[in-house]
Amino acid sequence: MEQIKAMGGKKGIVGINEAIAPDYAMITEVLDVDQSPMAKENDPKLKALDNYNTELLWEVYQEPRLKSGSALKELNSASDALILQYYEQPDTLEAAFGHNISRKDWEKIAHVKDTYQDVLFTAPIVAANVAHPLIQYMYDELRSPDRKFTFLVGHDSNLSSVATALGVEEYELPNAIEKKTPIGSKIVVEKFLGADGKEYADINIVYQSVDQLRNMQLLDLDNPPMIYPLTLKGLEKNADGLYLMEDLNARFEQALRDYENIK
């Protein structure tokens, strides 16, 4: 819990919420919360939107989750729904319920969901625990001499926890309103055999741009997805931007040890 509180600085959990208060305000503006029947009736449930004392729930063998009744919990659901509406509704005015908002404003809306993911899945001790099954599977697959291609399907929470467990440096994706794990994004690890006989690895996050998503564009060689290189803390890339495979394997092994250390 202390690692999560540290994300908000001296104010801890409250500090996390205060940092995204403008993003909360954007969501409530788009939803016309102040004009809603609940607001007119002074429904006490709306007090949750001003509650910055986010509470986390922990259960053995379960992923962490947030207790209902806080701004982050309730407005994350709204953020998620609005993001999908923005992707699916061609008319941006209609997507925002008649509000003329900018791409930057949509980034604010999506930032609430990004923060929610960070709180739940990117504290180092949480990531090491939650990501462990995937880290083990990926490690085994990457070391399999006969494996040519492996495709794993998961959730944005899986991407967040795996990236943290592997020590990926902070990043913000271009041409995306979701800056870390856009819908449909994938972490792609490629292996190469160098002319020197050594194995190398490239690690990127691959995703569709906002326009590709909103316009439902087919992806091909003439219209490829976005590819953003991920950087692993403490590891050096060569001139081609690749890591030594033995260094990447060592990073996976460290992530596996991190899990063992918290058992």
Where are these regions (language model features)?
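Signature for phosphate-centric chemistry
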Residues: 1-150, 154-263
